[in-house]
Curated annotation (Swiss-Prot):
Disulfide bonds: none annotated. This is sn-glycerol-3-phosphate import ATP-binding protein UgpC. The complex is composed of two ATP-binding proteins (UgpC), two transmembrane proteins (UgpA and UgpE) and a solute-binding protein (UgpB). It comes from the Bacteria. It comes from Bordetella bronchiseptica (strain ATCC BAA-588 / NCTC 13252 / RB50). Its EC number is 7.6.2.10. Its main location: membrane. It is found in: Cell inner membrane. One of its GO terms (biological process) is glycerophosphodiester transmembrane transport. GO terms for cellular component: ATP-binding cassette (ABC) transporter complex, substrate-binding subunit-containing.
């Protein structure tokens, strides 16, 4: 196990194209960090720099307080699990898992001991003689993880390992990875674009946007107190409703197109009064037929136990996530107009209109 540190790490490609704008972060021994963000945000580039597959333009990456910028990948004592498994098709499961150890010229008895131990952890014991083509997608990914485990590295790197799996298998493999980490407690860095993976796996998550870490925190910190409108709109399904509003000195709120919101001034903090800001409301923290604003229903999504009600209020689209029972008590059809508003039990979110950052002190 090991610590992992980033000291003002930057990456610029040829032509002075910046990809990573400067990251400072410390990963504790045994911590599971998930880097999440949309395509092109720099998350995989950051992981590749840790692995030694990309050079660091500026700053330092340290493993156990040792700068590794100039070390070859093989010298960093890390193991990486890829999205596409990267298995040798002509080798058995055993040989795929043992290959890296053979290259390092470990004794045969030690190799067998490590492979069989990893196979037991991952429930691959009966599959060691099979070739990859005879395995399911989930089994192949477990072999890829087994190949990383047998190396007994200081740091695990996971590069979108579940992206090629179907939805049901992704859920199962998330649980496998959670159990694996609890058992091995190895420092881990995990890259994904999937917020569900980030929320369920991470001790802390790094939300990346355009090469910048927008927010670093525990999953619940990020969910309950997003640092920016980007984070608010990226974490949460459906994402947070964001409305451009003008707040009067008396706490009365109007949308940017002049529609009054029937919200108690007591729910409006002093920091936003007399200003133009962005107000955020989580869909699951809103109610139908509640004080707030009138919205015309444009679409209703039925998800079994839940309903997603999409309504338009002027230029803003607003989504309410409610139980099917609550929805049945408020029968509504597309084209109807309903009042929707906050449930009063959860605070509203407020962001700066110009920067998108969370209003300080809130």
């Amino acid at each position: 196990m090991a610590t992992l540190s980033f000291r003002n790490v930057k990456k610029t490609y040829a032509g002075n194209v910046p990809v990573i704008h400067g990251i400072d972060m410390d990963v504790a021994d045994g911590e599971f960090i998930v880097i999440v963000g949309p395509s092109g945000c720099g998350k995989s580039t950051l992981m590749r720099m840790v692995a030694g597959l990309e050079t660091v333009t500026e700053g330092e990456i340290l493993i156990d307080d040792k700068v590794v910028n100039t070390l070859e990948p093989a010298e960093r004592d890390i193991a990486m699990v890829f999205q596409n498994y990267a298995l040798y098709p002509h080798m058995s499961v055993f040989d795929n898992m043992a290959y890296g150890l053979k290259i390092r010229r470990l004794p045969k008895d030690e190799i067998r001991k490590r492979v069989e131990a990893a196979a037991q952890i991952l429930e691959l014991g009966k599959l060691l003689d099979r070739r990859p083509r005879a395995l399911s997608g989930g089994q192949r990914q477990r072999v890829a993880m087994g190949r990383a485990i047998v190396r007994e590295p200081k740091v695990f790197l996971f590069d979108e390992p579940l992206s090629n799996l179907d939805a049901k298998l992704r859920v199962a493999m998330r649980l496998e990875i959670l159990k694996l980490h609890r058992r091995l407690n190895t420092t881990s860095l995990y890259v994904t674009h999937d917020q569900v993976e980030a929320m369920t796996l991470a001790h802390r998550m790094v939300v990346m946007y355009q090469g910048v870490p927008e927010q670093i925190g525990t999953p619940m910190e990020v969910f309950e107190k997003p640092a920016s409108t980007f984070v608010a709109g990226f974490i949460g399904s459906p994402p947070m409703n964001l409305l451009e509003v003008a707040v009067g000195g008396d706490g009365i709120v109007h949308t940017s197109d002049g529609i009054a919101l029937d919200i108690s001034p007591l729910a409006v903090p002093q920091q936003v009064r007399g200003r133009k800001v962005v107000m955020g409301l989580r869909p699951e923290h809103m109610l139908l037929n509640a004080q707030g604003l009138a919205a015309e229903i444009e679409m209703i999504e039925t998800l079994g136990s839940e309903q997603l009600v999409h309504g338009r209020c002027g230029k803003h689209m607003v989504v309410v996530r409610c139980s099917t029972r609550q929805f049945s008590e408020t029968p509504a059809r597309v084209g109807d107009t309903l009042t929707i508003g906050p449930d009063g039990r959860h605070p509203l979110h407020w962001f700066e209109a110009d920067t998108g950052r969370r209003v300080e002190g809130l």
